[in-house]
């Protein structure tokens, strides 16, 4: 399971918990749009906003869930991908973008390309929190610590970004190799840097991706895998201090009068 699957499903779960959430695709490959519908994959989006050919209100997509909106990456030709990434790298453009949003959203989730360049660095420079999915596979786990160095360097230069946590994904409880990678990660990093929630390898995620929906909308009665992202959303709320911002607004609900 990759970053886009995590971004979409976590955002959906957070939106269902009442947070006004915007998912922004900064990957020139258009991973968010490709994960949903062909129409969204071909729609104008961030690239057109950045190029000043479309207003922000014209490129944001309102989903059927009122609290969830999506900004696809837009039409980025292969030959223009590097220039697009370079344009976002210093964070200035994305900073202006966030300023224009003002108070319309509680959460803005950037789905970025893999690696530490271009739009990934730009998004990190303007963000408060980073979630780093780490597949429970040897190659992916070896690169996990690199993000701590990048965040540290950014903070030394004045950025406010911090690591909300590593999210272990594709975990196979019955597979010795998969468990060994996860256990090595749990052993080598401070406990507070690793999210308690883990995402298993589950066919429901592939099925949902093929259907172009979050796993929570795969069927009218959501599969058990959807509960994992509900748990993740609750954990992210607590770690990011979101619940404190609504203290006093979340009272017990009586079951009967």
PLM region spans:
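Walker A/P-loop phosphate-binding motif and the immediately C-terminal alpha-helix
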Residues: 1-29
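Cytosolic-facing regulatory segments adjacent to core modules
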Residues: 56-57, 64, 70-116
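Conserved nucleotide-binding/hydrolysis micro-motifs of P-loop NTPases
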Residues: 28-29, 76-77, 138-139, 171-175, ...
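Active-site signature of alpha/beta-hydrolase-fold catalytic machinery across serine-
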Residues: 9, 13, 35, 122
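C-terminal lobe/tail of nucleotide-utilizing enzymes
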Residues: 156-257
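Conserved catalytic-core segment of NTP-binding enzymes
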Residues: 16-17, 22, 102-103, 107-197
């Amino acid at each position: 399971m990759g970053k886009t699957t995590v971004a979409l499903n976590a955002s959906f779960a957070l939106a269902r918990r009442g947070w006004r959430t915007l998912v922004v695709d900064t990957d020139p490959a258009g991973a968010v749009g490709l994960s949903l519908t062909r129409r969204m994959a071909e729609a104008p989006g961030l690239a057109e906003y950045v190029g000043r050919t479309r207003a922000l209100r014209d490129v944001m997509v309102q989903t059927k869930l009122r609290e969830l909106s999506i900004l696809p990456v837009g039409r980025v030709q292969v030959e223009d991908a590097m220039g697009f990434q370079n344009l976002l790298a210093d964070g200035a453009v994305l900073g202006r973008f966030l300023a224009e949003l003002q108070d319309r959203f509680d959460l803005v989730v950037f789905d970025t390309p893999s690696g530490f360049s271009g739009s990934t660095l730009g998004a990190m420079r303007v963000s408060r929190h980073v979630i780093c999915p780490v597949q429970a596979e040897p190659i992916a786990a070896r690169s996990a610590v690199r993000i701590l160095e990048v965040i540290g360097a950014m903070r030394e230069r004045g950025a406010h970004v911090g690591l909300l946590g590593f999210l272990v994904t594709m975990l196979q409880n019955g597979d010795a190799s998969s468990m060994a990678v996860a256990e090595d990660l749990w052993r080598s990093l401070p406990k507070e840097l690793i999210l308690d929630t883990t995402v298993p390898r589950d066919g429901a995620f592939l099925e949902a991706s093929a259907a172009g929906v979050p796993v929570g909308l795969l069927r009218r009665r959501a599969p058990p895998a959807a509960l994992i992202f509900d748990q993740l959303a609750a954990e992210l709320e607590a770690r990011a201090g979101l619940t404190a911002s609504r203290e006093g607004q979340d009272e017990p609900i009586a079951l009967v009068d």
